[in-house]
Amino acid sequence: MITARQSRAARALLGWTQETLADKARISLTALKRLESESGLDVYETTRDQARRALEAAGIVFLSTDKGQGVLLVDDHGSKPNPSNAAR
């Protein structure tokens, strides 16, 4: 399950606004704001799922351990060489 903090962190890594994620996830902006709220508002599981799928499609990996939760942005799935690493 995607948390409010994970959603906000993932958007920050991607440089996406709430409007961008709502559009890519095909959910309303209001639904996304509810998901990202810390006030405990009810959110449909389908809303969480659609947001998670959109973020994962953009390269986000959701992390969850007994010590906490987080997000990771995978570097373009390895499809392009990174010029800054080519000489190393």
Roles of regions detected by a PLM:
Residues 1-2:
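A detector for short, charged/polar N-terminal pre-domain segments
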